[in-house]
Curated annotation (Swiss-Prot):
The gene is eno. This is Enolase. Pathway: Carbohydrate degradation; glycolysis; pyruvate from D-glyceraldehyde 3-phosphate: step 4/5. Keywords: Cytoplasm, Glycolysis, Lyase, Magnesium, Metal-binding, Secreted. Pfam families: Enolase_C, Enolase_N.
């Protein structure tokens, strides 16, 4: 019933109008799993390779026909007859067949799409929801929780065409008692932020992740606008809603000069100065989580940041760790950061993703499940967050169907699981329990 009889891939379009890989895995019992690979804009240099065609006459070089050749050729051939419910074995076949450190032969986009489609097919064969199957694969069968959302309501950096250097300003509805209530609070703040920005004569156009993308005089001005919106929605900042930021600092790091050039504010910082700048923002506003607060290569700076802020704040490594257990292990050993951002396509398979989550949790780090700026209607990360009881999720704002698809899937899961999947709110954030 769970043997693979067919694997196929196709080229579909993501939320930025670029092609991506979608895969289907068909089993002998008539079960089918389908999944699509996401794509990032601000990417870590050590991420698994996303294979693009480079043919400028087609999709401006962004086509994925080479990756599809791998899916429909060697990957499909190698997986025929294999048991889809043995996810680790399926992923290992593809990893071995690719044979490179960073999946550059077939592309992480090819391997990941098949890996996730296989997980969905395996869940169907077992007659269970994907989150339940993931919990079993994770060795935590029956252990679920609903994640605290980090909602990216002001976009900057590589995710927007504005002058704001910091990439994401997020809210966390920590006063909510359920995930459903958290979504409502987030939506109400989002709509009030639109009113606040309009009243200031600012743009309410949205960026890649559905947050507003106005030009602002400073990064602090973004936080001030969110504070105003939270209060206008009838909530108290710091009690009902907390703040989080993704600096994506690698995007404004000047490697030659070794400093951080925030062109939007006209300021240049050393690593140490930028850490104190972040500390100052966290003293002014109830920021509880900072992601990629320095360049991915600035490990000495990250060590200082962790020592300076890590007892009070969640210090999240995204480009820093790229969902890679080898790099994460080094970070744990050196006491760098205290949390990891989890992105499937940074590593390229479900099995390796689960290994990174487990390593983080075993070391006392938190794991934040995340989308990418280039997304599709695929909502697998919702099931991943619940099935691993990760506790936190980043999946954009309260607009754009590519973001809302994940929130809606989480609402369905909460309805199905009820009390079996508690919503723990702020307790899930490192340093806030």
């Amino acid at each position: 019933m769970s043997k693979i009889v067919k694997v196929l891939g196709r080229e579909i379009i993501d939320s930025r109008g670029n092609p991506t890989v979608e895969a289907e895995v068909h089993l002998e019992g008539g079960f089918v799993g389908m999944a699509a690979a996401p794509s990032g804009a601000s990417t870590g240099s050590r991420e698994a390779l996303e294979l693009r065609d480079g043919d400028k006459s087609r999709f401006l070089g962004k086509g994925v026909l080479k990756a599809l050749e791998a899916v429909n050729g060697p990957i499909a051939e190698a997986l025929l007859g294999k048991d889809a419910t043995d996810q680790a074995a399926i992923d290992q076949v593809m990893i071995d067949l690719d044979g490179t450190e960073n999946k550059s032969k077939f592309g992480a986009n090819a391997i990941l799409a098949v890996s996730l489609a296989n997980a969905k097919a395996g869940a169907a064969a077992k007659g269970m929801p994907l989150y339940e199957h993931i919990a079993e694969l994770n060795g935590t069968a029956g252990q679920f929780s609903m994640p605290l959302p980090m909602m990216n309501i002001i976009n900057g950096g590589e995710h927007a065409d504005n002058n704001v250097d910091i990439q994401e300003f997020m809210i966390q509805p920590v006063g909510a008692k359920t995930f459903r209530e958290a979504v409502r609070i987030g939506a109400e703040v989002f709509h009030n932020l639109a009113k606040v920005l309009k009243a200031k004569g600012l743009s309410t156009a949205v960026g890649d992740e559905g947050g507003f993308a106005p030009n602002l005089e400073s990064n602090a001005a973004a936080l001030a606008a969110i504070k105003e919106a939270v209060e206008a929605a009838g909530y108290e900042l710091g009690k009902d809603v907390t703040l989080a930021m993704d600096c994506a600092a690698s995007e404004f790091y000047d490697k030659e000069a070794g400093n951080y050039n925030m062109k939007g504010e006209g300021k240049i910082f050393t690593s140490e100065e930028f850490n104190f700048y972040l500390q100052d923002l966290a003293n002014q506003y109830p920021i509880v989580s900072i992601e990629d607060g320095l360049d991915e290569s600035d490990w000495a700076g990250f060590k200082h940041q962790t020592e300076l802020l890590g007892d009070k704040l969640q210090i999240v490594g995204d480009d820093l760790f790229v969902t890679n257990t080898k790099i994460l292990a080094e970070g744990i050993e050196k006491g760098v950061a205290n949390s990891i951002l989890i992105k499937f396509n940074q590593i390229g398979s479900l099995t390796e993703t689960l290994a990174a989550i487990k390593m983080a949790k075993d070391a006392g780090y938190t794991a934040v499940i995340s989308h990418r700026s280039g997304e599709t209607e695929d909502a697998t990360i919702a099931d991943l967050a619940v099935g691993t009881a990760a506790g936190q999720i980043k999946t954009g704002s309260m607009s754009r169907s590519d973001r809302v698809a994940k929130y809606n899937q989480l609402l369905r899961i909460e309805e199905a699981l009820g009390a079996k999947a508690p919503f723990n709110g702020l307790k899930e954030v490192k340093g806030q329990a």
